[in-house]
Amino acid sequence: MKRGVWLLIYCYATLTKGFSLPGLSPTTYHSGDEIPLLVNRLTPSIYFQHQDEEGNDVSGDKEHFLYSYDYYNKRFHFCRPEHVEKQPESLGSVIFGDRIYNSPFQLNMLEEKECVALCKSTIPGKDAKFINTLIKSGFFQNWLVDGLPAARKAYDSRTKTNYYGTGFELGFTDVKQTVDGKAVPSTMEELTSEASNEDVILDARLPKNVKPNLVKTVELPYFVNHFDIEVEFHDRGNDNYRVVGVIVNPVSIERSSPGACSTTGKPLILDEDKDNEVYFTYSVKFVASDTVWATRWDKYLHIYDPQIQWFSLINFSVIVILLSSVVMHSLLRALKSDLARYNELNLDNEFHEDSGWKLGHGDVFRTPSKSMLLSILVGSGMQLFLMVMCSIFFAAVGLVSPVSRGSLPTVMFVLYALFGFVGSYASMGVYKFFRGPYWKANMILTPILLPGAIFLLIVIMNFFLLFAHSSGVIPARSLFFIILLWFLVSVPLSFAGSIVAHKQCNWDEHPTKTNQIARQIPYQPWYLRTAQATLIAGIFSFGSIAVELYFIYSSLWFNKIFYMFGFLLFSFLLLTLTTSLVTILITYYSLCLENWLWQWRSFIIGGLGCSIYTFIHSILFTKFKLGGVITVVLYLGYSLIISALCCVVTGAIGFFSSMFFIRKIYSAIKVE
């Protein structure tokens, strides 16, 4: 058994890294060829804690925003090219907030530059306050050179590895501490001019005679206005070069004229009470590298906390294997005993009294309340399940690569539309299983109800993004394209699936007949009641994806590259297996206690518990301070959407597992 476990782990370990598709051809440059530098949106970075000189955490007033800003937003006053041109992007890239434009930076292969003046910009005090707020919140700039993100070199002390962290700072913060009771200067100019006054600004290592409760933290935001660009290239000979890495070292320098370019000067602090003249400059350096084009992404794709992921997956895999072994052994033994007892014909007795789960044979296939809604949710859940499974699989084997921006969400949209056939087939099949009379209503509502509700919520979130002037606003053209894809592809396929299921699906052929009068359900133990069973079952389902959710949220909210799809695929398979086993087990023991109302219970127990824990996890993920009402609404709104979709997917898994289990066991008994 141990060999099987380790073999399974090894197989999935080979899927933990994606690879580039051969069809993505590299760009070869010659000496002097222009290398386009593109600018993308400004994004929030993952939470970090300020530290003093002794390495101790220092609390600050850092707030975090969960929406991005357009690079050429008027409040930033960045240098613009003569003609700003928006670059073509995929549907997924646009929906996830990418806004890529050309830039005034001039990069030519092997032509190094030193302190080139870019432009002079005047930043009003009102915009300076906005920029300072984003600097304190840890916003990053995102550039692209030859398809590679501009990065900063970073070191992971936990794995003791060097890697390239995508993006670089909009600015830096310097943490100072002030003694309460002393007047803190109201302007940045006064603050820096009095920096030598020890009564006002103290070193991070405070004297022992200063009481801690009198100390306050002040963050000084330094705005970046100089960029040291380092382009790594691979020499292929015969004056052929390929870009294999881009490093940007941002510098904050206060200048009074564009000619001065020392990096050792005073940092630039934007005054929030007056206009600020800012000179933007950049330098370019080319560095030869042995890295070949095919492996240039390896430096960017860094696994954070791999030991935690391996430990959690191995630990939970062992738990699932033990759980499945116990469940299958106990369940199969009990069923074998039950079936042998139920199918015995005692010729000496005129009457034979049923007991256990066989008592529900006349009610277990009874039509539940709101059968239309349940069938639609189950069918939509199956459609989402197949979309998620195939998307993760394609990414794990390398068919979807970070080389192509927005490719994964685009693939997910297309797969969801294509799987409309399967989703509607499942929905109509379940509705026939319930023997519902309004099959045409089911055919119409299945491709509209859940997608329409999600689309409406996204549009509402879009208005909040629009109010915040975020680059994450989905353009009307993209929304129209989604609707077009929906009605021209998904809806026709859904109608076809419903019609095929209505004519060919035989799920309405039940192994037992339904009694005219429903059997009364006796008192149930507390652990089998719906609410308690839901929370208990949800622990097992959520445990299989808890660790991966952290990395997914980090990628979703803080622009981190997520590529550990092998881990994610393994976790999703564990989620599917765990949800199925636990739901079947609870359904079986409920039937043994004559509770034949399994339809809604299997969906709720399989889905609601996991979604509740997922939503709680998303709330606990926000250890940081959310900046503003809009950020809170957006975070809660999108977390609610993710949790609801999780509920539908796992609920469908639980329902279908219970449905096929019940059909199997009741078709194996003889009912007189």
Swiss-Prot record:
Superkingdom: Eukaryota
Function: With EMP70 and TMN3, plays a critical role in the late stages of a nutrient-controlled pathway notably regulating FLO11 gene expression. Acts downstream of RAS2 and TOR. Essential for cell adhesion and filamentous growth. May play a role as effector of cellular copper homeostasis.
Localization annotation: Vacuole membrane
Protein name stated in the entry: Transmembrane 9 superfamily member 2
Family according to the record: Belongs to the nonaspanin (TM9SF) (TC 9.A.2) family.
Topological domain ranges for the Cytoplasmic compartment: 329-383, 432-447, 501-532, 587-601, 650-672
Native source organism of the sequence: Saccharomyces cerevisiae (strain ATCC 204508 / S288c) (Baker's yeast)
Membrane-protein topology: Multi-pass membrane protein
Signal peptide residue numbers: 1-18
Cystine residue pairs: none
Any Pfam family: EMP70
UniProt entry keywords in alphabetical sequence: Ion transport, Membrane, Signal, Transmembrane, Transmembrane helix, Transport, Vacuole
